[in-house]
Amino acid sequence: VHLTNEEKTAVIGLWGKVNVEEVGGEALGRLLVVYPWTQRFFESFGDLSSPSAIMGNPKVKAHGKKVLNSFSEGLKNLDNLKGTFAKLSELHCDKLHVDPENFRLLGYILLCVLARHFGKEFTPQVQAAYQKVVAGVATALAHKYH
């Protein structure tokens, strides 16, 4: 992902304020509510019968945190996203058979959640920088599919 120094500063600066547990749980929960077909990958998580059940599900929250911790690793390695996410790409492709489009959808959801949490701080410029990052991460996660 090519980011200007200004964009890198904006992305890293905002990320330092992110509560990965809260934002991760909300992002994954919203993915499962907004795009219900993604729930099939999480059948072992128990009750996903309603939006409130999904958003309150401790396994959804825990996995959302795990997802954002991986995203944090990507932010530390913006120049090597494919390498950073190679094993996760292989897992999601070969073992879990996740449609790579879901990575893009989660990226869009993450942008919505960041905007909700950070309001005016999530300026159009910050959003543009994050859009590049989530697109790069989605591409890296889809790499093993090609």
Curated annotation (Swiss-Prot):
One Gene Ontology term from the biological process aspect of the record: hydrogen peroxide catabolic process
Signal peptide: none
Source organism, top-level taxon: Eukaryota
GO terms for cellular component: blood microparticle; haptoglobin-hemoglobin complex; hemoglobin complex
Organism name: Lyroderma lyra
Pfam families on file: Globin
PROSITE patterns assigned to the protein according to its UniProt record, in alphabetical order: GLOBIN
A molecular function (GO) term: hemoglobin alpha binding
Keywords, in A-Z order: Acetylation, Heme, Iron, Metal-binding, Oxygen transport, Phosphoprotein, S-nitrosylation, Transport
CDD domains: Hb-beta-like
Residues reported in the UniProt entry to bind heme b: 63, 92
Globin domain residues: 2-146
Protein family (similarity comment): Belongs to the globin family.
Physiological role: Involved in oxygen transport from the lung to the various peripheral tissues.
Membrane found in the keyword field: no
Subunit relationships: Heterotetramer of two alpha chains and two beta chains.
Gene: HBB
The keyword Transit peptide belongs to this UniProt entry's keyword annotation: no
UniProt cross-references to SUPFAM superfamilies, sorted A to Z: Globin-like
Record lineage: Eukaryota, Metazoa, Chordata, Craniata, Vertebrata
Protein name: Hemoglobin subunit beta
Modified residues (N6-acetyllysine): 59, 82, 144
Residue numbers of S-nitrosocysteine PTMs: 93
Modified residues (Phosphoserine): 44
Tissue specificity as recorded in UniProt: Red blood cells.
InterPro entries: Globin, Globin-like_sf, Globin/Proto, Hemoglobin_b, Hemoglobin_oxygen_transport
